[in-house]
Each structure stands twice: as structure tokens, then as C-alpha cells.
Amino acid sequence: MKMEEMKAQSFDHVSLEEWKKTAEASLKGKSLDKLHTETYEQLTLKPLYLKADLEHVEEEQFPGVPAYTRGFYKGGYVEQPLKTAHRLQAHSTTDLQAKLSAAIEAGQDALSFSIEEQARMTFRECSELLASPYPLYINTKAHFLAFSAFLLKADAAELQGVVGTDLLSHFATKGLVPDEQALALHVEALTEMKQRYPKVKTIVIDTVPYHLAGANAIQEIAIALSEAVFYIEYLKEKGWTPLEAVQLFSFHFATGSQFFMEVAKLRAFRKLWTALCESYEIEGEAVKVTIGAETSEFTLSKLDRHVNILRTGSEAFAAMLGGVEYLQVTPFDQFNGTTSALAERVAKNIPLILQSESHLTKVVDPAGGSYFIESLTNELAQAAWEKFLQIEESGGLLSVLKAGTLQQELAQVLEQRIVDLAVRKKSMIGTNIYADLNETFFSEYEGMEVLLADRPVSSYKELLNQVSEERTLAELHVRDSGEPVIPVKSQRLAEPFEQLRERAVGIQASGKTIEAGLICLGKLKDFKPRADYVTGVLSTGGISVQVSNECHSVEEALQFVQNTQFPYYCICGKDEAYTEFGPNLMAELKQGQPAIQVDLAGKLPEGEQAEWLAAGLDGHVFAGQNLLDKLSSLLALWEGGATHE
């Protein structure tokens, strides 16, 4: 086709009904509903979104306009630059100083480090760190009172950024809700910090602990809003105005693996936050609260750890499309032992690549106008607001934590996520599918244990008076005081599969070889699909396989078992081969080797199933099976008895 002819071409308008008809034809008789996706938020994602999906969405047309769904600033990152705040890990303050200097030279523009690892930091060492002109982004967690005391005693007049903690979420992970004593000390510290460092945000509303406990996007947004209400109302009782409280707020989220949901989560939060501010008559610049995000630890795996680079890259991308101000990327080998220099470098470079090569900071709200994202944002906002009101009607976040209802709801979502991974409804490359049996495992980094003083203090000023040059954060740590509740427990999604692999490594360390046999019936082209499937399933549990030659008779199958002497075998073939060989194969196998366990790949018709079971069949390996349960029972074969050496 010539260029002039190409220019003359046009695309015919296609109606929705025509599209549906064509789509249904491609599904070969299946309903179009097969293309719909149910999310953990109980929302339904459609395969196609049109302008009609935005008919009931009342949205502003531009960023920087209330309700700020498209961003707080008209110029996006051009007006309010992204701050990369890679959280550095270091064994000592000296090491931390060196890493901070290197990070700044490499392009990092906010200082952040794991304060738990720096509990041995002295006041003198802290003062030296504060000499940097760059903003801080530090979640102090258990060390807020001690670290803020250091800051107040130091000479750091230009201090800015975020240095704070979330008393509610931090205590919840410990199985506590703060009592009046803990809250009063916290307010004293906030008051002193506000007077001394007005540019520092000291109330970090951190939803990450809930995210790590399995929370969906609706729950995360609702919890963030409910925590904000708690802090505003409590500080009002202490004489603060809502505006004074909000000016100290910084929200911190984790962005997970559901890319578009995470983008919509951040956009929906801004919309609802604006609505909440309106209810407190807060407007203007005060509404433009600081929002930070970290890539999710929940989605990371020790297994095939380099895949984590893809996960964190996608999650960082979602965070930037969502318009966060601070961004932290987790190193890909965070849970494989001491973080490598390569992982640190990759984590620091991902935001730089998204800025300098993808130019995300040059486009204001790239997600704006997408029928899908705008519609999803609206649905998410409506559902999250309803959930927020439900929490408030139940007495607020403290009440639902005390009652245990929130923890129960989080546990239900977490359980569903794990089950979906176990039955391969969801895939995690290298973890529940395409596992690499040859990769090397590393022990989880435990760091240097520091004994915290856990001191009781009657007032914050008493703590301030105890600061001296060589006093450490650990020595100034204040005892947590609160009412016991069910803990908000953190768990990574991959942990159950990691535990299976660690069991396998332990078995091998005892001198045993974990190997199973596949009895393959018929020709290669007939048994290969099921043999490959079983091989993949067993590898996720750390079990390697030896595949038999083509077995065209019961005698050949028996000979393979006799030669290998494994404790476990799986018969693989087409359904026709199962019918041809019949239960007699099973009976002969068990007669010769009664101690072995034998499964069948796939499922049998009900009529044949009973005969095979009667002949000695132990079970099946099939799609949709709970792999965690199956593999756990199989590993017990090697843990409990002699195995092939």
C-alpha cells in the first residue's frame, strides 16, 4: 500500500455491542463475564472501559484543583519535585555516614535510614548527621521520643522533612493500643518539635503495617482517614486546632503488585482526604499534605530474588503515577541476608530511571483521563469512604482495634491472598511457579541485637534532661504503655512457600536427597504436558524429579521404580493411558513396593477413581490443588524416613 493510500484509510466506528459480539466469538461460547476480574476490594474490573463509565464521575479537569484527585499541584513534579528517600541500612553510624554521602552523590535528595539499626547512635553522632542540608524522611517507630529529644538538643535550625511515628499502627503491631500516658508523652514531644522545627512533619500516618497484614486498598485508605480523625480529635482535646494538627501530618503508604489499583488508591486517597479536610473547615495549602510511599515488602520473595527488581520497579512506577512526594524502593534481596551493594544500587536507581529516562516527572498526572483509572479511582473512593464511615460509627480506629474486628478483617483478606497463591489462581514467579531448584539460599539478616532501656518517664522534659553527648537512642528508649489487643501481624505473601523450600534445604543438610520419580505412560508427546506440570509443582517445594523413559507396559514402570527406589512417585500420562493401564498398574506398584507413595497427575472420572484408590492410589496432583498442603505432606516423606541417597 502506497503512502497516499495509507493516509486515505480510516477506521470504522465500532459500537459496544459489536465489540461484545466479537469478543464473545473469540471466547468460543463462554460468557463475556470470563473477562471480568474480581479484586480483593470486592470490585469488578471490566475488560473495556468507555467514556460512558465516567458519566457519574464528578472530577476536576486539572491537577492542583480540589478535590486534588489529579494531584495537589498544577505543575505536578515540576512544581513539587519528587524526593527519592532510599532507606539506608548500616551496621554503624560511621558506615551510615559514608552511605549517606555516597547516596547524595548518586542522586538521592532526601536522607532516610533504618533507625532500628541505629539504636546505638549517640547524641554526638546524631548531631553530625544533621549537618546535611537535605530533608529527612525517617519513620522513627519505637524511637520517636528518644530521637526527637536528640533533635531538640541539637543545633539544626534548618531541619525539614519528615521525622515522626505513627503511634497507633506501631503499637498495633506489638499488640497494644496506646494509653493516656503514651499519648500524653507523644503530644509533649509533638508540641516541642512544632515550636522548634515548624518545617518538620512529626505525625506519620503509616498504613504499611496494615498493608503487610493483608489489607486491601479500601481498607488502607479508610484506616488512613480514621487515624487522621483520631489524631485531630485527640489533639483538639489538648487545645490544638484541626489546622495545627494537619500541618504536622505525613501519610505513608506501600504500593503493591496490583498496578492500576495502587495508582487509583493514591488518587482516591487525595480525593477523600480533601473531603475530610472540608469537614474540619481546612482549605488551601494546608490540604496539600505530604504523601510518601515505599515499594511493598509484602510482595517480595527470597526465592528467585532478582524477580523482585521487576516487582519493585512496577510498584515504584505506580507510586509516581499516583503522585507521591517521597519514594522509597526496597532492595531486591532485602530478605536474603545482608543487602548487597548491587541491590542497594538498583533500589536507588529505579526512581532515577523513572525520572530521567521515562520522564515521569515531566508529565503532570499521566493517569488522568484514562477511562479505566478514573472509573476505578471513583469506585475505590466511594467504597473507602463507606468503610471509613463504618469504622467511625463503630467508635473509631481504637475501638475496632480493641474489639479485634479490624484484625479479623485483615486476616480474612490475607488468608484469601495466600489461598489464591497456593492454588495458583495468582502467580508469583520463582515462588509458586517456575521455581529454581539450583538457587542459593541465604539466612535472613538479623542485625545486631540492641537491648533497649525501656525506661519509664513521667514527662517528656524529664527525657530531654537525660540527653548527653554519649547517650544512645537505646538508653533513652521509653517503655511502651498501652492496652493489650490482638496484634496486627505482618507477613510476606511468599513466606509459606519459602518455608517449604527451607524445609527442603534442612532435609538435604541432613544428608538426604529429595528426589521423586515420574512414571510416564505412553509416548513423550502424550505424557509431557502433565509431567512438566508435576515437575513444576514439585520444584516449588524443593523436590527434584527423575523422569522415566516411555513406559508402554506395567513391567517397564515396575522396573523404573525398582531401579530408583524413591519414596514418592507420580504417574503421568493422558487419560486414555490411565484407562489402558488401569488400576492393575497401581496394584502391581504397591505389591512390589508397599511403602512408596504414588499419586496420579490429573483427575480420574468418578467411576475409575474408586478402583484406583482401592488398588492403592494415594492421591493426585492437579491444577487448582492447594500446593502448600500437598507439598507439605510430601516433604514429610523425607523428613520421617529413609530416602534415596
Where does each model-flagged region fall?
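Structural signal for hydrophobic packing residues in well-ordered secondary-structure cores
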Residues: 23, 27-31, 104, 130-134, ...
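Ordered, soluble secondary-structure elements with a strong preference for glycine-centered loop motifs
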Residues: 94, 263-264, 340-341, 528-532
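Active-site capping/gating regions of soluble enzymes
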Residues: 250-444, 597, 619-628
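Catalytic-core signal marking the mid-to-C-terminal active-site face
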Residues: 2, 36, 349, 355-513, ...
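A general structural motif
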Residues: 309-310, 548-554
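Short hydrophobic segments within beta-strands
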Residues: 517-519
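Catalytic alpha/beta active-site cores
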Residues: 1-258, 289, 330, 470, ...
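Short, hydrophobic/aliphatic alpha-helical segments
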Residues: 25-30, 305-315, 457-463
